[in-house]
């Protein structure tokens, strides 16, 4: 690719939650050959952003930040108090992003992960409007920090609201704020999209972040993902930015249960990271 890709990996591959002690992973991530580390923020109070920033600098790593949106961080909840909790959490995340000098916060922040139900069209509209109105407020908050938000479609088993590139673009259009942008995750795309290349083109220049693993959450290159189409799509839109491996360790039981990881996907998590990066560089570097 002629445009610059930063190859990254999420610390979820090894640990959960991310804390200040997780900086012990950074030398290994750099040694493996990564440009970027992705920090998932489950609890902002566990993270000393200035300590993290120094460790990133010491190891020559760039950083991206994603949020974690469980039942207590649901902008479509019927109780406005839950919205307030989510706003407070997002404010903490935005402050962390500013200290780390990143440009956006990523994640499926329109609703709670795992909220997947059959509801009436009337209820769906109520929840959609809640998401739009609350995300307009989130965008105003983000803009106050000179940040964007990267909204992520999830597969149908994890969300009943935003599953495809077309869905997320409708959401971005309805929000109608320049801070509303998009993250695409190849794992979810292999479940929901009819054509990966077309989906990427649907998002176009709204795409500011990309996550990948495989259709089975395993090492990139070992599954059914149409990687040629993936690369062509990113080439079409002249994408430059992060290409981050996001998978999980079955050793952290709570996290494994949340994402349905019941078995190891490689001999070790380090091998997962090593093999995955090798494949991505072979595929996405010209």
Where are these regions (language model features)?
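Histidine-acidic metal/acid-base catalytic patches
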Residues: 1-11, 15, 19-30, 103, ...
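Structural motif corresponding to the early beta-alpha repeats
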Residues: 35, 39-132, 240, 244-254
């Amino acid at each position: 690719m002629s445009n610059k890709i930063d190859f990254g990996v999420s610390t979820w591959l090894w640990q959960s939650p991310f804390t200040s002690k997780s900086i012990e992973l950074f030398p290994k991530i750099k040694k493996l050959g990564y440009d970027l580390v992705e920090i998932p923020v489950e609890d902002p109070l566990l993270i000393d952003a200035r300590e993290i920033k120094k460790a990133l600098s010491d190891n020559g790593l760039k950083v991206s930040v994603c949020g974690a949106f469980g039942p207590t961080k649901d902008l479509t909840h019927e109780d406005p108090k839950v919205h307030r909790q989510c706003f407070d959490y997002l404010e903490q995340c935005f402050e962390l992003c500013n200290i780390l000098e990143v440009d956006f916060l990523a994640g499926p922040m329109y609703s709670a992960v795992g909220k997947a139900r059959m509801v009436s069209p009337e209820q769906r509209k109520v929840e959609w409007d809640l998401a739009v109105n609350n995300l307009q407020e989130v965008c105003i908050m983000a803009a106050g920090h000179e940040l964007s938000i990267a909204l992520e479609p999830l597969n149908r088993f994890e969300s009943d609201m935003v599953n495809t590139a077309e869905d997320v673009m409708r959401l971005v259009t309805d929000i109608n704020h320049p801070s509303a942008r998009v993250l695409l995750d190849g794992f979810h795309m292999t479940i929901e999209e009819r054509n990966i290349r077309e989906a990427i083109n649907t998002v176009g220049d709204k795409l500011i972040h990309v996550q990948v693993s495989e259709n089975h959450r395993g090492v990139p290159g070992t599954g059914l993902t149409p990687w040629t189409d993936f690369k062509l799509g990113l080439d079409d839109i002249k994408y430059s930015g992060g290409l981050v491996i996001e998978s999980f360790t079955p050793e952290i039981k709570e996290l494994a249960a949340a994402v349905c990881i019941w078995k190891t996907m490689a001999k070790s998590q380090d091998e997962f990271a090593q093999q995955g990066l090798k494949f991505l560089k072979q595929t996405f570097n010209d």
